[in-house]
Structure formats: C-alpha cells, structure tokens
A protein has these predicted regions:
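Blade-loop segments of beta-propeller domains
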Residues: 52-117
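Beta-rich, blade/repeat-based domains predominating
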Residues: 34, 58-69, 106-118, 151-173, ...
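Bacterial Sec-dependent N-terminal signal peptides
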Residues: 1-23
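Short loop/turn segments immediately following beta-strands, especially the blade-tip
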Residues: 42-48, 89-95, 133-142, 191-197, ...
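A short beta-strand motif characteristic of beta-propeller blades
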Residues: 51-56, 98-103, 146, 152-158, ...
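Loop/turn-rich, solvent-exposed surfaces of beta-rich toroidal or solenoidal domains
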Residues: 260-292, 296-322
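Short loop/turn segments immediately following the C-termini of beta-strands
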Residues: 30-32, 78-80, 125-127, 135, ...
Length: 361
C-alpha cells in the first residue's frame, strides 16, 4: 500500500512538472503568402520542441496579446482599409481557437495591441492613431471608445512625413498608457481614468530622426527601454508617474539600416535583446545593471531574414524569433548566465511569421 501511494505521488509530481514545461504558443502572420491566419502550438520550454495544435483563418494577424488568464487572445487585422480591426479569440484546451468578435479600429494598419482589465488598445501605423476599446465583462467583445492622434515633426521626409503610431502599452503601475509617436520622435502619455484615457502630454521627446517603435519595462517598473526604428538605438529611461527621463542611448543597429524592430528583457531582468532588420539582420544583446538600469552591449546573434518580432519563454531558456522573409521561427537556446544565444536549428516553418506569444498550460 505504501508503495502504491508513493508511486501515485511520484507520477502526479512528474505530471505537474511536464505540464509546467509545456506552453501554448500562439503565432501571428501576414496572410499575403502561404499563411491563412493564427496558429497555435504546444512548445516545450525545456527541450525546444514544437507541435502544431490548431489554426484560425484571419486576415493579417500581425500582432497578438493574451489576456491575463490566457483565455482570450487579442489580435489585430493589419489592413489599410475598413477591415482593419481588433479581433477577440477564445483559447480553449489543447490550443483550440474560436473567433468571438471583431471591432473596427477606424485607423489603418493596426500593428500593435495591448489589453489590461477593461481596456484594449491598438496602435494604428498608417492611421497615425491609437484606438481605445472598452471590453465587455467577459472580455469577449470590444467597443471602440475613442481615438488619439499622433503627429509629425521628425526630419525624415520619406518615413516621418505623415503621423504613425507604432506601439501602445500599459505602464507597470497600472495608471498610465504610453504610445510611441513615430513621426514626431516622442512618446505620448495618457492617464487611465476608469474605462477611459485622458491625454497626459508628452512622456518624453527622443532624439530627432529616432522613429520610436517598441517600448518595454523592467520588472520593478523603475526603468523603460525603447527600440527606435530609424536611429537603430536603444534608449534607457527612468520611469515615474507617466513620464520618462532618458539616461542612456546605445547602438543596436551598428550598420545604419534604419530597420530597428522589437525589444524584450529576459525574465530575470538581467539581459535585454533588440532585433534589427534590412542589413546585418540579427539580435543585439545587452547586459542590464540592476541598480542604474544602464546597458552594456555584450553580443550579437545573426538571424534569418527580417526578424520583425521575438519573444522569450517564461523560464528564460529559449528565445524564439519570427523571421518574416525566411518563413520561419528560429529557436535559440539562451545561456541564462551569460545571456548569449545559440541556434538550435529546430526552426518552425511558418509562412510570413511576425508575432509569437506564450501562455502556460
């Protein structure tokens, strides 16, 4: 009897460990090639192995984010017409997906989405705007509440001649939203007031000809890091009450390709990664000083063509990079001590892959 009880306990323990190792991985794509929408996979964050689970037809789901309970997926449809939308998808057991609702962004080419509590946001690149949605109690429907417009003012007359908003994210303190105003070389601030946003001025003005693109925050919320597309630089900031104070600029794109893309911190906050496109494509690697927030460049990992977006597994063991023009997701094993990356050559074949997100099972 003791043996049977012990055996059951051991089996249960092994099952729990295996369950923690497995993630539901959701991939967004552009559908002008061989893809038809969103794909779900089971990804083992200890072995780096992936297995496809389901797919859902959707036009250009180029950016995705999950609800806090991972039951809802928010996906943009990045189109330059009235079909540009925010889509809400149910994520079921075993990665099954069902489209619940869609709402027009009323801003062309939504390329980023964030959701928290009763609000969802899309950054509409060609529309030059940020759309603010109120979510239903169950999180299965979205109603457009308002739009905020970006501006121009940057010196690049071909890339900054009309407004572009590229990213909108909630601050860690839960009180503000920051949006990258690409063409005006600034980051805008909005105060959260219940189910609405109130304009809160300029969080920071960045260097001219930067083209601010994506923003991420340190775990403790004291620092923020910006990847700028045109300058190819990462800017480190101190964050406080909806404002950013620049403390450092450091080069990510060392060849001046003007194709800076995505940016993420490792789960432990000790390393930062930024991707670069168009020339010498790859991911720049930086160490982070925990006390000051300052960065030191320590490496560079070449990738496939056009590394538009990437993400790290929750345990920090792997970095997965969406290489749009190579039609694959590269799987890199990450040394958690040094922060450096090694290509596992376990590529996941996905046509026009541009976004990957993870949820624990």
């Amino acid at each position: 009897m003791r043996f049977n009880v012990f055996s059951c306990m051991l089996l249960c323990s092994l099952f729990c460990v295996q369950a923690q190792d497995n993630l539901t991985m959701i991939v967004g794509t552009y559908t002008d090639g061989g893809s038809h929408g969103v794909y779900s996979y089971r990804f083992n964050q200890m072995t780096g192995e992936a297995r496809v689970l389901d797919s859902l037809a959707l036009k250009n789901p180029s950016y995705l984010t999950l609800s806090s309970d991972a039951r809802r997926l928010y996906a943009v449809s990045e189109t330059n017409d009235e079909k540009a939308s925010l889509n809400i998808i149910n994520i079921g057991r075993n990665g099954t997906m069902q489209l619940l609702s869609s709402a027009a962004t009323e801003g062309a080419d939504p390329c980023y989405v964030a959701a928290k509590g009763a609000l969802a946001l899309t950054a509409n690149y060609s529309g030059g705007s940020m759309s603010v949605f109120r979510l239903s109690t169950k999180g299965d429907e979205a109603a457009l509440a308002t739009r905020f417009l970006g501006a121009t003012g940057g010196p690049d007359r071909s890339r900054q001649n009309v407004p572009h908003v590229h990213c909108a994210c909630f601050t860690p303190d839960g009180r503000y939203v920051l949006a990258t105003d690409f063409s005006a070389d600034r980051i805008l601030s909005y105060r959260i007031a219940g189910q609405r946003l109130v304009a809160n001025g300029v969080a920071t003005q960045v260097s001219a000809d930067s083209g601010p693109r994506h923003l991420t925050f340190s775990r403790d919320g004291r620092f923020a890091y910006l990847m700028s597309e045109l300058s190819g630089k990462v800017t480190a900031f101190r964050y406080s009450q909806g404002r950013l104070e620049s403390i450092q600029e450091i080069v990510s794109d060392s060849v001046g390709a003007r194709g800076g893309a995505d940016i993420h911190l490792s789960p432990d906050g000790r390393f930062l990664y930024s991707s670069n496109r168009l020339k010498d494509e790859g991911i720049a690697i930086f160490s982070v000083d925990a006390a000051s927030g300052l960065l030191t460049r320590i490496g560079y990992q070449p990738t496939g063509a056009h590394p538009r977006q990437f993400n790290l597994t929750p345990n920090g063991q792997f970095l997965l990079c969406c290489c749009r023009d190579s039609n694959k997701i590269q799987v890199f094993r990450r040394d958690t001590k040094t922060g450096l990356l090694t290509d596992t050559h376990k590529d996941i074949s996905v046509s026009r892959a541009v976004c990957v997100q993870f949820a624990s099972e």
